[in-house]
UniProtKB/Swiss-Prot annotation:
Official protein name in the record: Large ribosomal subunit protein uL24
CDD domains per UniProt: KOW_RPL26
Subunit-structure text: Part of the 50S ribosomal subunit.
Record InterPro entries: KOW, Rib_uL2_dom2, Ribosomal_uL24, Ribosomal_uL24_CS, Ribosomal_uL24_KOW, Translation_prot_SH3-like_sf
Coiled-coil region list: none
Encoding gene (name): rplX
GO biological process: translation
Gene Ontology MF terms in the entry: rRNA binding; structural constituent of ribosome
Length: 131
């Protein structure tokens, strides 16, 4: 399944402490699988890392020849349901849909803005075998 939010998209935080902030998506984690204390697999909801949003402080040990120790500030994860794509055409936060367009023997899949109904970008392109 294609992702509604991708790396490089500009998004707006719509819920939480950081509400209203905008930033560029640095990384998208579709689904993270971890184990709990009992060793059972746990699946976490998808989340994104957004540039300049939800800055957290980490205490790091120095590694000789690599980095200095101290307190560093880095972006923390935000649940993907708490952000909306900022449409490049109408410049508003919007929900994203998918549209399939067939032209001749080529099938193209686009992401589109549900507010202004304009295509955002091409997701995939397939050549249909003629019959």
């Amino acid at each position: 399944m294609a992702a509604k939010i991708k790396k490089g998209d500009t998004v707006v935080v719509v819920r939480g402490k950081e509400k209203g902030k905008q930033g560029k998506v640095l990384k998208v984690y579709k689904r993270v699988k971890r184990r709990n204390k009992k060793g059972e697999p746990v699946s976490l909801a998808p989340f994104v890392i957004v540039e300049g949003v939800r800055l957290i402080k980490k205490h790091v040990k120095p590694i000789e020849g690599v980095r200095e120790g101290g307190i560093i500030e880095t972006e923390g994860p935000i649940d993907i349901s708490n952000v909306m794509l900022l449409c490049p055409n109408c410049n508003k936060p919007t929900r994203v849909g998918f549209r399939i367009v067939e032209e001749g023997n080529v099938r193209r899949k686009y992401r589109y803005c549900k507010k202004c109904n304009e295509n955002i970008d091409l997701v995939s392109e397939k050549v249909i075998k003629g019959g």
